[in-house]
Amino acid sequence: MATTQPCLIGQIIAVPQFHILFSPRNSLKPELSTNKRTNFSVSIGLRHSFASSISTCNPKAPSLSCLRNCAAVDGADTSSSEDKWDWDWDRWNRHFSEIEEVESVVSLLKSQLEDAVEKEDFEEAVKLKQAISEATVDDAVAEIMRQLQTAVNEERYHDASRLCNETGSGLVGWWVGLPRDSEEPFGRIVHITPGVGRFIGKSYSPRQLVAEAAGTPLFEIFVIKDTDGGYVMQVVYVQHVKQNLTISENSFSKVQQSSKSSINDPSILDVRGSELKVDKKEDTQLNAGEPTEEGIKNVIKFLKDKIPGLKLKVMDVIKIPEEEIVGSDDATEELVGEGTEETNSSDDEEEVEEEENDSIEAISSMDSADYGKHSNTKLVIGGVLHNIEDSSIDDEIVRVSANIMDTERDSFILHVPGRSKRDIDTRKNRVSKEQVTALAAQGLSDLLPPEVAEAFWGEKASLKVSKHVHEIVKLAINQAQKGNHLSEYTAFNRIITPESNLDPFDGLYVGAFGPYGTEIVQLKRKYGRWDDAEGSNSSDIEFFEYVEAVKLTGDPNVPAGQVTFRARIGNGSRMTNHGLFPEELGVLASYRGQGKIADFGFKKPRWVEGKLLKLNGKGMGPYVKGADLGFLYIGPEQSFLVLFNRLRLPE
């Protein structure tokens, strides 16, 4: 293809202001001439190189000097220098845009490189690799990582430590963040990785980690090199805009749906980090059907198959007023609430309180099948939050100045100025009872097997939703509106995992706790005694080996950072009687322990007896497959089993 520009071959994409990053002399200059725009471009054809209207470089062999000549056109007339310490926020914003432009070009070149390698066009691959190196020649982060690797290889640990402290490179890795100035119960799993011109901290939900999905950018650390050869960092918090809660009013006009519609064609509930949408197909309404006797039997059989000896209390099901909200207790949910004739609001509240005092037992379980391919399915009666996570956020972003303080080897604090506790915690929104009922209906349709979910829906009866489920849904919607919002101070601690997975009692696990969805816990072996054990002043204090599981993500009952269970695992601690558990569950060993439960809002936290189960990973039936561990919480009123699968963090 003929062209008048010596450095240009193939189809061209112009990259405005790409030149700013390629001249070390001009990297400190905030103002560059705009009336002398360079035709800096990159080819996306089979042959590629960089182009300039004044360059005479060989198009078949783009060189570093060619790249810099192309980049230096606009900077030639700029004689004043500026220290990056003097950059104002507008100048930083321009730098952010420039970095994004470079990153898009590098991403394009890497994509071409992968295609060339796949086609075994190694000559083209070499050229593309050289082009990538030239495009990132002034990338401060790439230079820092090279220097760090060289210092470690040459055992210059003092230089390596200095780089880690001064450039943010020591923060690369996995972290868990907990708010310091907010009562929010949820922790954040964050992965900090080096990128083009910056270190990127991405937040991951348990579902994103299980599905190996891309994380959501939470904060960034931009690094630039000053005139003295040192480095300057600028931390920014990535705030997602357009986070308005959009729920169609028509979606909640009715809360009844036929059994087939609720199972096969339910409303689509979509939460994208900070945006909650309910999309409804035409002429589709939420209707409730009449549960059949066979359907109720399917429900009971399904639950009793999970845990032997499970006791269920089933009441009569009759017409329930739409305005009525109802019944579950914490992480366990009622199967069917006792219905009454339409009454006033005060009678409804009294009925709800009476029903919540009934001792109705249920079991929460999880489906660990196909963890890597699909979102895991958990069995939770009345669950409403399992399937409303999503890994993508399409909102526009706004960068807000932040800073990192109290940096240690395995901890640091992210400070976002101006984000007070009052601003974070007081943004509450009213949710109608119709919305709550619709969300609960959707949750049942998604969570239960068809024959089980169908039993809950009929032509005349509707499922009553408890006060606690109402609060759960309100919390979910509030979280959806808050999205990726951080508190003003967030303390991060490094997640240290074992190099191998040979020890079942050391590492990360993912499990489902009641209706709150999947959560991540970290197991660690310890030796000593439990802090709240009785007889602490006694002379015969017993020390023993035990395993402790700490929640990294958390839920409104037991928040992140709390111990969720512990069990003795030393010599003589293994229990021999496995007759209480079905053979299909695959129990290899069991250990006596304790589990922590609490009321909503982490009220009345208490320890209950429990058993830690080591499983063979084969599972039982189509609903529970591949679980590695389980913990049975034995409460005074009800017991429930939580199954865990080992979680391996991506490198």
Swiss-Prot record:
Highest rank taxon of the organism: Eukaryota
Spans traversing the lipid bilayer: none
CC terms in the record's Gene Ontology section: chloroplast; thylakoid membrane
Keywords recorded for this protein, A-Z: Chloroplast, Plastid, Stress response, Transit peptide
Region (Disordered): 330-359
Domain UVR: 103-138
Transit peptide feature range: 1-69
GO biological process entries: singlet oxygen-mediated programmed cell death
Compartments reported by the entry: Plastid, Chloroplast
The UniProt record lists the keyword Transit peptide: yes
Keyword Plastid (UniProt): yes
Function: Together with EX1, enables higher plants to perceive singlet oxygen as a stress signal in plastid that activates a genetically determined nuclear stress response program which triggers a programmed cell death (PCD). This transfer of singlet oxygen-induced stress-related signals from the plastid to the nucleus that triggers genetically controlled PCD pathway is unique to photosynthetic eukaryotes and operates under mild stress conditions, impeding photosystem II (PSII) without causing photooxidative damage of the plant.
Family annotation (PANTHER family): PROTEIN EXECUTER 1, CHLOROPLASTIC (PTHR33917), PROTEIN EXECUTER 2, CHLOROPLASTIC (PTHR33917:SF2)
Protein name per Swiss-Prot or TrEMBL: Protein EXECUTER 2, chloroplastic
Organism: Arabidopsis thaliana
